Amino acid sequence: MKIEFLGHAGICISTDTTKIVMDGWFNKNGAFDGSWYQLPANHFYMEEDWSDLDAVIVSHEHMDHLDPEFLTRLSDNVPILIPKYPSSNLFEKIKFLTEKEPIELSLEDSHLIGDLNCHIWTEESPMNQDSIWIFKTNKKSIINTVDSRVSVSQIKSMKEFIGGDPNLVLMQGSGASWFPVAYTQYNDEKRKNVSIKKKESKLNYVLQTATAFNSEHLVINAGPPAFLDNKIFYANNDPIFPNPQTSKNWLSNKGYAKTIHATMPGDVLDLETNTLNQNNEIRKNFSWDDYTEYLKNYSSEMEPNIVNIKNKIDSLPCENINEKMKEHFEKMFNVSLYFNERINMTVFFDIDGSDGGKWIVNFSSKPYFKEFEENDKFDYKYSFNSKWLKRILLENLPWEDFFLSLRFLAWRNPDIYNDHLLGLLKFNDESATKAVEIFEKSSSTETITVENSSGEKFEIEKFCPHAGASLETGIIRDNHIECSLHHYVFDLKTGNCLNANCNLKSKKLDNDN
């Protein structure tokens, strides 16, 4: 079994009889309206002959994993395989962008693709519709975690499916996030410190999970992207986007002793011989150690593409923007009463540009939409240009796709994450939100006992109230416990969540208990 790394999250897995591509992303228009580009450039793969493919896989709906141009160029005989999520958003997105119908694979069954035995897991909470794929032959196995977080119980079931430790695990070291990059409540120093803390939390998760997998090879995959639009070029230096070499060095310094690879497009790992054949051609012009000049040249090269994307959006006709905005959110209010109640906040949309306006959107048990007035109170604020609002209202651009472009500013008070606000904006779908509601209402009654740094004992819920991860692996600092999966932090004495709208049941035990 061989794995060719295609850049970003893309891989090509081949055996003597089977060849598949997963999450190939090669086009010169990047992703998220030209805000993300492949790093380093891998556009040469678009011209490759892929006629011998047995299948292509798209793990989830983010556009750095779903390349419509690549999928459209493929022969109709090559099936497009996707996980069967609670929502049909991924299916409909591929069908709309490519005029091809993907095949949904169930999560309950194993699937044979040529001589590759494949099984799919998804994140335990349906709030995050991302997937983990395992491929195995009689001799070798690969776990591709893509952008997903994997729980302790899932690691156990994956290793049971394989029958031991995997040969290769692919994990993301960088983030796909706009926090804290786009948030205005921080000065530059505070924002940098928040980013560093977030990077450390992510890499600690990678270290813990990679150690549990105990694979022969670990590949740091799926990012970071290059931000080539001049208006967001600054984000290339944000600590939340470490490159694979930075992540590799961090893990090695923390004592991870297995083989780690910081790959580039064209590198091929042969699991039979345990050798990595590097693409030396691409290394003539690019190095993970320093690519400052590379990014400047890359930005200049792609500028015409980015300008063209923006011009097309500018040309979108838009009348009655206020009515379209009102219709958009009043439909969203009817998607899920549960989400409205869990959000329970007022959002201010401050949109500049020729088709702009100012609006208040209240999500609660009695939601409402109105034009902004000077004395209106709000908890959250989004500011951006009206060209992007046209993409959302007229072309159904998902809010999450827009947020990932970093072309906005945000502010919130209190400064805590509201998972349900993002969930409703990104899904806007009854099936998806209902799956989350069922998951969150079916919480376990199991408890565990933990001890703080002072020796006090607390009985707490065994599973994190956010996404159901076991808190047995939680990190305890002073009177706080941090979930190792998504880094929600809880006060053991009160149960309050310090960084999100999500509380933990906690009870202090007597010393004799």
Protein language model features and the residues they cover:
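Zn-dependent metallo-beta-lactamase
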Residues: M1-H43, W121, K426-T449
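Catalytic core of the metallo-beta-lactamase
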Residues: G10-D16, S110-P166, F463
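Pre-active-site segment of Zn-dependent metallo-hydrolases
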Residues: T18-V58, P68-R73, K84, V150-G164, ...
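Active-site neighborhood of phospho(di)ester-bond hydrolases with catalytic His/Asp-centered motifs
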Residues: V21-D23, D52-D64, L81-Y85, I143-R149, ...
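Active-site HxH/HxHxD metal-binding segment of metal-dependent hydrolases
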Residues: N42-D109, R477-L509
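Metallo-beta-lactamase
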Residues: I82-K140, T246-N249, H261-A262, S443-E446, ...
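Cap/insert and terminal regions of metallo-dependent hydrolase folds
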Residues: S153-K254
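Feature captures hydrophobic
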Residues: L269-F463, L471-T473, I481
